[in-house]
């Protein structure tokens, strides 16, 4: 009863693209990645999961079609779960700049896609919000949209971004955000812990949900510092991280 987890991408449809095949792509002479390269595999895989009865998890969805396909599959009883990332819920291709910190895979999609993802979070179609944390060196991310490596960091900004843009605006509750970032991943992937009780592993984070801070990559603890959220003013910061009973991060 193991789960199958997939990064969905049809290679034949990529055609050398590296950002979303939208208005920005065309106006600036870039090669685009079409939405179908993602949702076509999800559509196929959901049919296979329905036929076989297997558990299927879709990583970092980014398109409105993906949300719709998964929503309909769940309604049919398919054992499918999915996730998206903070950047797909708070940015779109209108926010792109000629900078490697805006390059990730899947790419930032259209505003319509972003809004569909938000609806998917609200109605429960999307189960998990994960960082898709992909650290790269400064050199690897210094070659613009075309030449930079795919992927951005997210560990140090995820809660602040989502708390600011989804919770403080009333789109979802704090409890739902915690569930999507912490509880649901544990349940889906059969990870022990995640409970505050005697004898349970002490894996905890202490968060100040109202603390205001500005995203400064130079202050990141991690080596990867390519973030599209640079200079964003956020509410909600991690003050303490305990892993297996040991304090591994402290900013009290």
Functional labels for PLM-detected ranges:
Residues 9, 62, 85, 134, ...:
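Anionic group-transfer/hydrolysis microenvironments
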Residues 14, 67, 90, 137-139, ...:
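Glycine/Thr-rich phosphate-binding loops of Rossmann-like dinucleotide-binding domains
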């Amino acid at each position: 009863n193991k789960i199958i987890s997939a990064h969905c991408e049809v290679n034949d449809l990529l055609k050398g693209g590296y950002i979303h095949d939208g208005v920005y792509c065309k106006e600036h002479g870039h090669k685009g990645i079409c939405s179908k390269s993602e949702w076509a595999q999800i559509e196929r895989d959901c049919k296979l999961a329905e036929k076989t009865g297997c558990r299927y998890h879709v990583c970092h969805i980014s398109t409105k079609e993906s949300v719709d396909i998964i929503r309909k599959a769940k309604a049919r009883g398919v054992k499918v779960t999915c996730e998206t990332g903070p950047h797909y819920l708070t940015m779109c291709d209108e926010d792109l700049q000629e900078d490697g910190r805006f390059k990730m895979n899947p790419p930032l999609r259209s505003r319509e896609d972003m809004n569909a993802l938000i609806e998917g979070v609200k109605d429960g179609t999307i189960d998990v919000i994960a960082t898709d944390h992909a650290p790269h060196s400064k050199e690897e991310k210094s070659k613009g949209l075309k030449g930079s490596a795919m992927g951005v960091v997210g560990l140090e900004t995820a809660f602040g971004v989502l708390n600011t843009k989804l919770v403080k605006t009333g789109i979802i509750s704090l409890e739902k955000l915690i569930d999507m970032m912490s509880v649901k991943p544990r349940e889906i992937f059969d990870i022990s812990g995640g409970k505050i009780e005697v004898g349970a592993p002490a894996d905890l984070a202490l968060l100040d949900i109202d603390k205001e801070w500005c995203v400064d990559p130079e202050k990141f603890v991690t080596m990867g510092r390519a973030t599209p959220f640079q200079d964003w003013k956020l509410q909600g910061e991690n003050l303490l991280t305990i892993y297996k009973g040991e304090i591994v991060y402290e900013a009290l």
